[in-house]
């Protein structure tokens, strides 16, 4: 006779997840708008800015499958998600203090590698937790889209009022806020791996 799973109480899973998505897409929206302007203010020319912006896109092709595979092997999501988010915020502090093309590119590479798994891990976390609670993904994810639009509107105002060389600090602040929200997420139980998965290291 199997034991019935205990019912999940109202643990505020969806609102906390919505807060994470809002923070993530505020971060993404502001970064997309303000980061190239800051790079220009730091003295990088158009070619150098192009390299700095393009490099993370290539690195994500490697970092995303590696990061998500490691998380899958652990069977847990909260820990890897929080760790990568906190490392991403710390990496952006390195970017803020970097000076010159080489130093900035090196710091951006670090951020790209540690940040790539954040969204795939959060989506896996969301789908697992929402399904267990009989909730839909769309309404929660909607807050990310709303936040992205708001970030672009706020970013436009920021560009007109803040010196370009100081734009990095609001960007860093949004990365830090995103990382903090991962610590507020409801902890999900780890998914146990089957004996076959353990024996094959998958």
Language-model segment annotations:
Residues 14, 96-108:
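Helix-loop junctions at membrane interfaces in 12-TM secondary transporters
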Residues 62-76, 158-160:
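Helix-to-loop junctions at the C-terminal end of transmembrane segments
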